[in-house]
Amino acid sequence: MARVTVEDAVDKIGNRFDLVLVAARRARQIATEGKDPMVDVQNDKPTVTALREIEEGLVTAATLEQADLQAQEQQEHAEFASVANILSDQ
């Protein structure tokens, strides 16, 4: 597959500044948070993988925000369950 150009990804996001924010956020998820790439990695670095995901329309600012909210809700639910378990043992 040909390399992703910034212009291709900008068309999906809207402007270069938002593209940088979305791509950096997604690359960080792939590199350090253990999130699975949605495209074939092909020995690419996380930043290139993030740009390819954006170009293919798989990642947007809205999808990242929604995923973060779901993760936060799951964490809060687990914390509440732990607290309830501790209180019920007393």
From Swiss-Prot:
It catalyses: RNA(n) + a ribonucleoside 5'-triphosphate = RNA(n+1) + diphosphate. Its EC number is 2.7.7.6. Signal peptide: none annotated. The keyword Nuclease does not apply. The keyword Methyltransferase does not apply. Keywords: DNA-directed RNA polymerase, Nucleotidyltransferase, Transcription, Transferase. GO terms for cellular component: DNA-directed RNA polymerase complex. GO terms for molecular function: DNA binding; DNA-directed RNA polymerase activity. One of its GO terms (biological process) is DNA-templated transcription. InterPro entries: DNA-dir_RNA_pol_omega, Pol_omega/Rpo6/RPB6, RPB6/omega-like_sf. Pfam families: RNA_pol_Rpb6. The RNAP catalytic core consists of 2 alpha, 1 beta, 1 beta' and 1 omega subunit. When a sigma factor is associated with the core the holoenzyme is formed, which can initiate transcription. HAMAP family: RNApol_bact_RpoZ. Promotes RNA polymerase assembly. Latches the N- and C-terminal regions of the beta' subunit thereby facilitating its interaction with the beta and alpha subunits. Belongs to the RNA polymerase subunit omega family. This is DNA-directed RNA polymerase subunit omega. It comes from Alteromonas mediterranea (strain DSM 17117 / CIP 110805 / LMG 28347 / Deep ecotype). The gene is rpoZ.
